[in-house]
Amino acid sequence: MSNRLPRALLADIAAVIGSGDHASALMRLGDESGPEASAAVSSYRAQCAAALGDFDAAERHLRVALDLVERRMTALPADEAARARLAAALTILPPADAPVTPTLEVISPELTAVRLRRMLAAVFMKAGRELDAEMELALLPVEARSL
């Protein structure tokens, strides 16, 4: 379970968001009661909010998601092999709006943080906040700065 939703349901939500079916994802996510405990769930809520044009809610959910993965990153020891995999992954990133899975959140909070920040920059671009988007992208490694 992640944020009180079974992982199989979260995989289904990621798939429907990936197909562009935000309406179905919104229904599967249910209400927003309680604290969010999963960056993936927060990012799914953000993507649904952005699809509805509620960019403030999308930003809020993505900030929660970033906070969750950044806290996880500080709790994990540095791993040279993981850094090498991250460097390789940065060269083949999916589109900025590609859903983040709960598994990726656990396996690589660093890559998850990069993807969430790119997602936030894309939300800012959709909202007409180009300067905010540029500032978010500037926080990323050079390889990850394009949308």
Residue ranges of each PLM-predicted region?
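Structural signature of alpha-solenoid helical repeat junctions
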Residues: 4, 37, 44, 105-112
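Alpha-helical junction/boundary sensor with strong preference for TPR arrays
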Residues: 36-37, 68-72, 76, 143-145
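Alpha-helical segment of the N-proximal tetratricopeptide repeat
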Residues: 6-31
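"A position-specific structural signal for the A-helix of alpha-solenoid helical repeats
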Residues: 11, 44, 112-115, 119
